[in-house]
Amino acid sequence: MNEWLAGQIVHRFIQFSRGERILGYLKKINQIPHLSTDRIKEMQLEKLQKTLKIAYNNIPFYRKLFDESNIEINNLRLPEDFEAFPILDKDTIRVNYSDIVNQKIKKRISKELTSGSSGNPLTVVKDRDKSAYARAVMYRCYNQYGIEIGHKQARFWGIPTSPKYIFKEKFKDEIANRIRLSAFDIHEKSLVDFTDKIKKFKPRYFYGYPSVLHKFATWILDKGHDLKELNLLAIITTGEVLYNFQRQAIETAFKCKVVNEYGCTEIGILAFECSEGNLHIMADNVYLETVSSNKSKITSQIIATELNNEYNPLIRYNIGDMGVISECSCSCGINFPVISSLAGRDSTFIVTPDDRYINDAILEYTFAQGIKQFRAVQNSRDSLDIKIVRRPELADRTMDEYKKKLVKYLGTSIKIQYEFVPDIEPEKSGKLRYFISNIE
């Protein structure tokens, strides 16, 4: 579709029909990231107090929790007082979801399903006003790289299997001016198909899982293909932890900057990478905090509270990720705090029999040259099964060095089994995780 038509006509019509004020919000919030740090903190506190008051006065589930926690919402101090409020997990939200609704607000809503990396997807109900603000935040992020509403997107994502949802997603892709390249079935023929479709469609930017984009990139490099004529504005990765080796391969293959997006279906974009490489928290839409985990002394659990949702706000919601939040002076001009370290799901730690928790990034650092792809699965504390797709140039001696290095990090109490395979299939979600922990 013509980009002007997609952005100026189709998008505006859809926005109007859904009752979403995306463009209005976008104009209103554009300069917020450049406010002073003190003003941003004041704004967060004001929004948080408003959210808590609405939740207390209109949502019985939250009123009960506030009363039990003895929280005085009229004189809230951050973060001291807020820490008394219990942390909610996905199971708690799922069980009580119908009660976490402001019955005084009658709005049109939409439903979305989380990807369910934990195996338990959550149906999320969103009111259109909340969705509009979240989308405005998204476009504000994308605007940093010259991406405008209506620009063509190549989306490396999952494809529904139900005929009903296949039609729905195709319609959404059409009006969003994007093509969808399946993350579910990646092989030689599909990668050739990716290339042909991309050349014909001429997208302005890529969006998708880093593991899928990395696999496409390594194939492009192996085949000697050249797609630099696309002149992409950016390649946005999301849905998984982005590893350095993935970033390097993708940028080399497509001659374009990779930008990391961190978010969740429940809330939207939580943080976005700036031109200087910092992952800035969208502090006008979400309040993020970290809580120390018993599992790791290095990183902490990321806890999120929505700031613009009067209908069914998530308050102190455990995202399920681990990270470190810090304030820094960034030369990009954005004064939002940053996530200085993001470890992904708290299940992405290799657990040893002697109760050590080792971030799965150790696998990335161990398997460097000569390995095309790998997946490690831990089913018990004393075992780790690793599948490896090796490149022709991987010498046995080099592989032996990798094995010794991993033993050095993990110790001898954990038995490591290796299997060389021709390919590694993605999961049902379309993601290609490099480490899967099945330890409770």
What are these model-predicted stretches?
Residues 1-113, 119-134, 139-152, 195, ...:
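Nucleotide 5′-phosphate-binding alpha/beta core
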Residues 50, 159-282:
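Conserved adenylate-forming
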Residues 55, 114, 153, 206, ...:
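Residue-level signal for inorganic ion chemistry
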Residues 136, 189-190, 321:
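Active-site glycine-rich loop that binds ribose-phosphate moieties when present
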Residues 138-173:
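Conserved AMP-binding loop of ANL adenylate-forming enzymes
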Residues 206, 310-311, 315-412:
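AMP-binding/adenylate-forming catalytic core of the ANL superfamily
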Residues 233, 242-329, 346-348:
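Conserved AMP-binding/adenylate-forming
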